[in-house]
Amino acid sequence: MNPERSERIEIPVLPLRDVVVYPHMVIPLFVGREKSIRCLEAAMDHDKKIMLVAQKEASTDEPGVNDLFTVGTVASILQMLKLPDGTVKVLVEGLQRARISALSDNGEHFSAKAEYLESPTIDEREQEVLVRTAISQFEGYIKLNKKIPPEVLTSLNSIDDPARLADTIAAHMPLKLADKQSVLEMSDVNERLEYLMAMMESEIDLLQVEKRIRNRVKKQMEKSQREYYLNEQMKAIQKELGEMDDAPDENEALKRKIDAAKMPKEAKEKAEAELQKLKMMSPMSAEATVVRGYIDWMVQVPWNARSKVKKDLRQAQEILDTDHYGLERVKDRILEYLAVQSRVNKIKGPILCLVGPPGVGKTSLGQSIAKATGRKYVRMALGGVRDEAEIRGHRRTYIGSMPGKLIQKMAKVGVKNPLFLLDEIDKMSSDMRGDPASALLEVLDPEQNVAFSDHYLEVDYDLSDVMFVATSNSMNIPAPLLDRMEVIRLSGYTEDEKLNIAKRHLLPKQIERNALKKGELTVDDSAIIGIIRYYTREAGVRGLEREISKLCRKAVKQLLLDKSLKHIEINGDNLHDYLGVQRFDYGRADNENRVGQVTGLAWTEVGGDLLTIETACVPGKGKLTYTGSLGEVMQESIQAALTVVRARAEKLGINPDFYEKRDIHVHVPEGATPKDGPSAGIAMCTALVSCLTGNPVRADVAMTGEITLRGQVLPIGGLKEKLLAAHRGGIKTVLIPFENKRDLKENPDNAKADQDRHPVKNNEEEQTLSLQNYPSVFLFFFFFFFEAIEAFNRFTAAGLKIACPAAILSLN
């Protein structure tokens, strides 16, 4: 029976290579040919409908009218995304089969006049039998073909439309292009199901043959492995019988190594006892290999070897100052240690923990400390470590056991007193294999690490001469472990510090790394400051280094393309030519003063950050809503701030009954990021006052502090990081709790000079400085009048209503 035909359509045509799209099929396509991209753009400009037609030959790059099949699928474009390499990723959904009656090429893209193909009338009873058989056969095919997930069968059972069922089965079959096209051209559903069942029967036969071959190969491999094992056993027996005379030479060599290692008495006795066991064993036995490996580790570990520690304070200070700009507290602590060491023969190595955001130089500082003290440097990355055996090692009862990473690193460095960097100590975790943080308690305790016990060595090892330096991004470290370390906080760099670091270290390093010659590139201070302000917003300097590296790469490309160019100078005026548009604003969190929007300050594990808080008031019944992934403490801060506003409503010029007639919504943007803590209390209070009075908040002011029900502002933590975040953002006025005034001494001098910091005791002081116009009693009468107008309008029939200009809301 010929299929019924519906109305004609005119539609853009997209040629496909090796792909046939069926109706109801959602598939992503990557389009690279210019004509095809123009076809997609034409479809997007019209009704997002496009006809997908397969090419007869996939190798044809520029297909003509005769290179396409005549039957395709009309599809809807769900999503279109242009990729950086010029190609386009498009997500399409097949809608209905269609046959091309006339295909034309207008130079821009293919266009066709086509007509939809409708399914003919069929015998429903016969179709029901075919559907059941097809599903059953497809289930058997899935059991043999492990590449198709079982969930496909579940979704197949939920499909009621036989045509859609047939197309879904066809989409999951590994058919050739011609077979896929044949299925597409079959408008008769029964014919399509019969064709697919025949294809499935053929595929099932092939898969069964493949399974039998795979089983035969597996048996053959097992036989080969057994023969190999027996041959190796035979070789071992022959070698044991014929080469027993060579064993004493190896034992003598191990004896000499034990004597030369200068082990403590306990360790030497253990090593010699193991050597005696080895002499009694067959050299080729598995146990002999384990014992030999143990003795090798015992003689590799440095029991007595030390590197000479430098005691010249002046030289050490020069090294630290040369390698790192700023970080005075850490440098002072190292110099104190060296000063004491110059007077005391035996001093336990300090255990320092450098805590700070990424990119401030914690890891590189460990290398500089090793260089300044004359110690060898060894680093152990603890990020992701979750097995206690990584620290303590495995017992020798396990196959393939080894010492822990700690002893392995000590054996590798070869001395007893290195600088040992424990990197990312806060990134450790635990599971059923133990807690590595608990294993480190013994390592980092100066009173206990003189006798550190490794499960593999089974003897005590002295770690008291090791200088341990740990690094961490946060204080999220178990309390007992934190108590054993001397914590030194590293805050983010100021703009002046970043400028000096870039000039001294980052720029010369990237010029050398990108093979630029002397005099070929000049980057002045204005360009570096522009990068810091408008292209990075970070506590450290990693992003700054990446941007400088980008400048160097573009300079190299420019020099190679233009041979006449000998020198490139980058300044603040032409910086955007190399780095593109500015990514960040500098000077304020927003461009203008806004009602109900406040800039707060937040502390994160990677340093401080600006936190925008938004409020909105709408007519309602007193419902309070807060969004933005806020924690319990932050939600309670909002409730406390609202109570403060209600208690002072008349004084602030707010109708005391506002809570009964207004719904309030508090939102903190970046809702995917969890936020918590009480330090946004005064910011919440100010946002509510601004929203209820219509008084804008100054965009150049940021604030932090906890609010009480009495309106008092309580002290907060992380002040230095928050002030540096405001400094990075160009905020000139910062409001802080009065009791945090003492913490201002720890802030860098240049940051102090660029910021106006106001310690405040209560919300009235804070709102006087932050609101564009401080609320007055006049506003109370205005809002009372405004509420009366609203009440009158609600009860007035359709007709004349009293208007209240919104502009009056900002009057004081």
UniProtKB/Swiss-Prot annotation:
Matching PANTHER family: ATP DEPENDENT LON PROTEASE FAMILY MEMBER
Similarity comment text for this entry: Belongs to the peptidase S16 family.
UniProt cross-references to HAMAP family, sorted A to Z: lon_bact
Domain Lon proteolytic stretches: 592-773
NCBIfam families assigned: lon, PRK10787.1
GO BP annotations, alphabetical order: cellular response to heat; protein quality control for misfolded or incompletely synthesized proteins
Assembly and binders: Homohexamer. Organized in a ring with a central cavity. ATP binding and hydrolysis do not affect the oligomeric state of the enzyme.
Name of the top EC class for this enzyme: hydrolase
Region (Disordered): 745-766
Native species: Shigella dysenteriae serotype 1 (strain Sd197)
Catalytic residues in the record: S679, K722
Protein name stated in the entry: Lon protease
Localization terms from the record: Cytoplasm
Known function: ATP-dependent serine protease that mediates the selective degradation of mutant and abnormal proteins as well as certain short-lived regulatory proteins. Required for cellular homeostasis and for survival from DNA damage and developmental changes induced by stress. Degrades polypeptides processively to yield small peptide fragments that are 5 to 10 amino acids long. Binds to DNA in a double-stranded, site-specific manner. Endogenous substrates include the regulatory proteins RcsA and SulA, the transcriptional activator SoxS, and UmuD.
Basic and acidic residues bias (residue ranges): 745-764
Catalytic activity reported: Hydrolysis of proteins in presence of ATP
EC number: 3.4.21.53
Residues given in the record as ATP binding sites: G356, P357, P358, G359, V360, G361, K362, T363
PROSITE patterns assigned to the protein according to its UniProt record, in alphabetical order: LON_N (PS51787), LON_PROTEOLYTIC (PS51786), LON_SER (PS01046)
Induction: By accumulation of abnormal proteins, such as at high temperatures. Under stress conditions.
GO cellular component: cytoplasm
